[in-house]
Amino acid sequence: MDEWLAEFIKRTILKLPFSETATILKTWGFLTESELQTFTLRYPKEVTATEVVRFCEARNATLDHAAALDLVFNHAYSNKKTWTVYQMSKRLESENDLFDASEFKLQFKKSIHAVSKNVTINFKEFGEALWIRIAWGTHNSRPNQYKATFAVYHSQTPYVFITGLGKACQPLMCQALVIASKYSQIQEMELKSRCLESLKDIVFKRFNQPFSSHHSKPHEKALTPNIVDPRVTYENMREKDRVYHLTCETFGEGPLPKLELASYKLETMFKADSAMSGNLTAVNEPFRCVVKFSSPHLLEAIRSLAPAGIAEAPISTLLSCIPHKARNSFKITEKRSMHPSSSQPTNV
């Protein structure tokens, strides 16, 4: 086994949490059951990693085996990366609509290798998802195994979740995906998150849907604590009930997909009367700014704003529409009419 390959396997093992090392190695499936039984997890992790490499050298591990280990690791810890959603469209007519994983892999590799031979491609299926790992190289250098691109594709859906894709490799990657999946177009959606499962929940519409306004209001018993002292009155009970009901109409009552960021790019022209007109209003270029909201769980944070009294209910649709429009990046511009002073805000 080459020295660089042994080093790559060793570094992958060192990234594993100590308590999960045995589980990951078992999922990897390269080491035999007897080898796993004789294997001893020891501190420091360097000792454990060296022992794994020794087993791999004895069994002549290849790059494919190392890539499989990397796939298992990134599947288990997918939240360590930021994922972007791509949507394909205009599916090509085919006599057989059933997904053939072998044909997909063949066409994907063929499409990329037709342009660049110095690329390693590996696949691994996890349930209904096909994971793809691509390490890109150049004419002068071998594929960089430490900066691989990962793509997750669910057959019979037009969505692909990608992380680690550089701009230079994006056209080739997108071309390979549409050819292999038998679509004709693909575009990047304005939707990103570290939580891969939450992105799937959004585009597959698996998250809790809010109930319509014609539903009966929640019982007050569920909204408020028991009144210990009957002399205590809740003067704002009606307002709390209204806020709770509007919040449920907007976001539902169940758990929401986990997103960490939402950004809004504002583009508008300065407008002022003649007394206030100056250099700014004379400039034809629009004013631009970016507003970003961040939180470990942004949608839950937004849902809690009105009940906490921080914002009025209902919450602005610019915030509440995130899961339904399947995007967390917006551009807000103005609809300009023929009259230069007439404009209306709009969001894209």
From Swiss-Prot:
Protein name listed in UniProt: Centromere protein N-B
Biological processes per GO annotation: CENP-A containing chromatin assembly; chromosome segregation
Similarity comment: Belongs to the CENP-N/CHL4 family.
Keywords: Centromere, Chromosome, Nucleus
Subcellular location: Nucleus; Chromosome, Centromere
Domain of life: Eukaryota
InterPro entries attached to this UniProt entry: CENP-NAC/CAD_complex, Chl4/mis15/CENP-N
Entries under Pfam families matching the protein: CENP-N
